[in-house]
Swiss-Prot record:
Classification via HAMAP family: ATP_synth_epsil_bac (MF_00530)
The species this protein was found in: Klebsiella pneumoniae (strain 342)
Biological classification of the source: Bacteria, Pseudomonadati, Pseudomonadota, Gammaproteobacteria, Enterobacterales
Protein name per UniProt: ATP synthase epsilon chain
Superkingdom of source: Bacteria
Gene Ontology CC, one term: proton-transporting ATP synthase complex
Keywords: ATP synthesis, Cell inner membrane, Cell membrane, CF(1), Hydrogen ion transport, Ion transport, Membrane, Transport
Length: 139
């Protein structure tokens, strides 16, 4: 049997996931993180993107995170997300529209602040579309 640890994914609105997992993949402030059983303790910021959860027996779940904090302790991992949305709950049409608007905003930006904000919005829209795509593949 594969080694596991307990994972909690919590947003301000609700507890999104709680259970045993084999591993997770998430984007931290320093880059991509793969958290396996026995990982060293860690506290890091999470960038907007997805968390890939590999549950017991290899079943996968994808959740969009708008950012937050990841805490790794012996035997347990906690994700405190600003916003968390399951892949099947994301609206593909709205994500595509947000991507289009962000791309337009980038083209028409007139300063570093405008460009940075538009780039962040584009990254969020692309992350949502990636979560939707991976969720469809996993079904």
């Amino acid at each position: 049997m594969a080694m596991t640890y307990h994972l909690d994914v919590v947003s301000a609105e609700l507890q999104m996931f709680s259970g045993l997992v084999e591993k997770i993949q998430v984007t931290g402030s320093e880059g991509e993180l793969g958290i396996y059983p026995g990982h060293a303790p860690l506290l890091t910021a999470i960038k907007p993107g997805m968390i890939r959860i590999v549950k017991q027996h290899g079943h996968e779940e994808f959740i969009y995170l708008s950012g937050g904090i990841l805490e790794v302790q012996p035997g347990s991992v906690t994700v405190l997300a600003d916003t968390a949305i399951r892949g099947q709950d994301l609206d593909e049409a709205r994500a595509l529209e947000a991507k289009r608007k962000a791309e337009e905003h980038i083209k028409s930006s007139h300063g570093d602040v405008d460009y940075a904000q538009a780039s962040a919005e584009l990254a969020k829209a692309i992350a949502k579309l990636r979560v939707i795509e991976l969720t469809k593949k996993a079904m």
